[in-house]
Amino acid sequence: DVYKRQIEGSGPLIVLVHGCPESWYSWRHQIPLLSEKGYTVAAIDVRGYGGSSKPYEIKAYSMRELTNDVIGVIDALGFEKAILMGRDWGGPIVWNTAALNENRISAVLGLSVPFFPRGKISTIDLFKKIYQGKFFYQLYFQEEGVAEAEFEENIRKYLELTYFSIDARGMRFQ
């Protein structure tokens, strides 16, 4: 189940998709403005965040599953089409939702993360190559149970790894 906070409007639907580690609340300042401009606004908690379901299996967080969640929100709200806006991790989710469901999406906006077309290798394999020997949160989450155990033991360590793990040159902070 995907948690959504909806503000009724009289116009087209805009689905707002947050980044990592955030929730729908990241959009709290944009929601009233977009609603006042005549849009119906749905800011969601992405699967695994906030009020949405949190499946244990890593495969439940595939891009296909995440894009299906966005389409599910559009359907649940009774709209045929929607405008999508995503920031950070929400960017790839909205870009891929649009690419896989072009007849359902009237516009897409990605903030802070550009569109990356599918390459010859998976995104995870690309990250493994780029971040060899360095911490990168998306790779960290691929190790089943490891992140969860470390969060419970020491949330501060997780936050330091996530926010202060590498500098602009890819060097690990100490």
Please name every model-derived segment.
Residues 1-3:
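Short, small-residue-biased leader/transition segments that mark boundaries at the very start
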Residues 6, 13, 49-85, 89-174:
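Flexible "cap/lid" subdomain of the alpha/beta-hydrolase fold that forms the substrate-access gate
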